[in-house]
Amino acid sequence: KFRGRRPVLYHNTGDYYSSNGYETRSELMEPNFQTHMNFAPTGGRACDEAFPYFKLQCEGFGLNIAVGWPAQWKANFRSIQGGVAMQAGQEITHLYIRPGETIRTPRITIMAYEGDYARGINLWRRWYFKHILPRPNGKPIPKIMHASYNGGGPEFTESTEQNQLEYIQKYVDSGLPYNCWWIDAGWYDCTLPDGTKFWPLTGNWYADKKRYPIGLRPISNKLHQHGMSFLLWFEPERVRPGTWLY
């Protein structure tokens, strides 16, 4: 429970294939309104239709709040007399652990600050940059300018070793400062019984042998020759019946 006058809860819509994605919204959490806000993402994707970062701004101070769980989390806030009550954690959890076993549970960060909304944002940014963002080789993450080629089909279901190597070379020859190559959904075996490739058929987390006969190594080797990094999409939480991981 957090005590404060005129608390306003700021939250974010997350990503849901909309121009309104990652939009900040606010709710006045006055007890007279009996406000009760529930948040949870969709499908185990931590930022799908909800965002695990919140700000509770009261008169003269505020709280930055984050739920550290890269899967299905939940959080709820309700107005109470004199402030706001909050609960947060992992959603849909029903399990037991045997003697000697351990599991990691969601981590919750709460940063209290004095001042207004803008000061809370600046403090959070400084803390996040210093303590959370990765620093490869001790340096800040460089700006990424990525390129890709999907082969002309839905997502990357028509990508092949041949067309990826061909287009990597084309981008290199263009002279533009690309430093990352992105292969998105559909590089794995996702073939339906009728022969159609359907990228949401996830769970076969290995390169489609018909399109990538010896895996993705030729792609990564080509990129490393030109000093580029390799960004590959996968979502192990999404598993379809009948697939390798299932």
Show where each model-derived region lies:
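Terminal connector regions
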Residues: 109-144
